[in-house]
Amino acid sequence: ALGELKRLIPENSTISSFFLYDGTLELGLAKYNRTVVAHTNKQVVYEFWQALKLHHRYLASIIEFMFERLTIPELYLLQDNWHQYKDLEERAAFFYILSHCSDSGYASHGNLDKSRLCPVKINSLKRHKSKNFYPFWDQFEKPLDGLMTAKNTDFLLFPVGKFGYNFFEYGKNTGHDMVSIDHK
């Protein structure tokens, strides 16, 4: 997908991306000379990316320290309350650890396996560069309400990822890091 987007979106373009979560496409485009404003309406997702952007080495050291000590039962307990921790760096670290250990890719739900997060991934955070990448917290309940904040942009990007489109979406449990999309 990144290769195709690089082909379609010229260098030095400005992109407003919505539904920021794992940042794969956004960071890839930013690395290849596109300015990316990555929107999310989830405060905990924004906090992770902002913490990574501002002090990646410190955040990586917290993640490394916690990951070595946390057990699987403790991680399952954290899935329910990680977003309630007062310390921003702790929340950001839990977000990263849980989302990388989860088979769903979400911090707030999924089956957990510590082998999904290898030390190489954590070490790569220490060398993280986020030039041309700007996380933006749209403080709206609905994620697409943030479209009105996308100013002076050449392209809009909607990497919605996996989603279920069925009659049983209403009432489905979602975590503080998960976006619910109304497909009606």
Where are these regions (language model features)?
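SAM cofactor-binding core of SAM-dependent methyltransferases
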Residues: 2-4, 8-80
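SAM-dependent nucleic-acid methyltransferase catalytic core
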Residues: 8-11, 56-172
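Aromatic-residue hotspot detector
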Residues: 19-20, 26, 103, 161, ...
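Conserved beta-strand scaffold positions in the cores of enzyme catalytic domains, especially
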Residues: 36, 135, 178-180
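SAM-dependent methyltransferase catalytic-core segment centered on the flexible catalytic loop
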Residues: 168-184
